[in-house]
Amino acid sequence: CKNEEKIYLNIIKNHQYQCNNIINNNIKKFEENKEILNMWVHDVKIPIAIIKLILEQNENLIDEKVSDDIDSEIFRIENSVEKILYLSRLEDFHKDFLIQEVNIEKIIRNIIKKYSKYFISKKIILDLNNLNFKVLSDEKWLYFIFEQLLSNSLKYSSLGDNISIYCKRTKNYLQLRVEDTGCGIKKEDLNRIFNKGFTGNNGRNNSKSTGLGLYLVKELCDKLGHKIDVDSEYKQYTKFTITFKCDL
């Protein structure tokens, strides 16, 4: 009996050793892949910066519409690369965040400045109201969250649509709302818009959609302890609400 026990024990130990090796090898591969991905992102950013510089230096020689189209595509590539970069960082979130006082209005205005050219070209009517609040969060992650919501509103808005960004304060909570009068979301898509890779009806009609932005927004909100909700009526409006605990 004792010999049989030893045999079984050795078999178990051997399997455990093999499993540990498989796990360690996968972890190593994952880290290597992540490093390769970060290098790729860096490599992609360099030619993008060069193309932008060439456009700036030759803006008088290039047709304005062609220049705007190229600039728009570059901007889209930059945003896609940024999403991939943040997706790769998500696994190490616990090592890469700093909770501090963050001013909501400052972040929103910086994003609007970054996207100003596209707001103007679409003749979007922007309404900013009651944004001067501070919350406890990580500034760079929160910037990314807000940017995804604003770029989403911009992407699915038509010429002359409205985008409203405002805060609502209650005793225990602060809510930031991003509301647009764009194409809206179909009822059957609402429960799935935060799923990884889900593009829905709007995404299928828009080749620029990856299904990553809102997935990352939800994941980051969960990790930061913020709550995100969406309300929408198809062909009428979409409203995203982020709820912060009032610690300040």
Predicted regions and their residues:
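Short conserved segment of the HATPase_c
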Residues: I185-F198
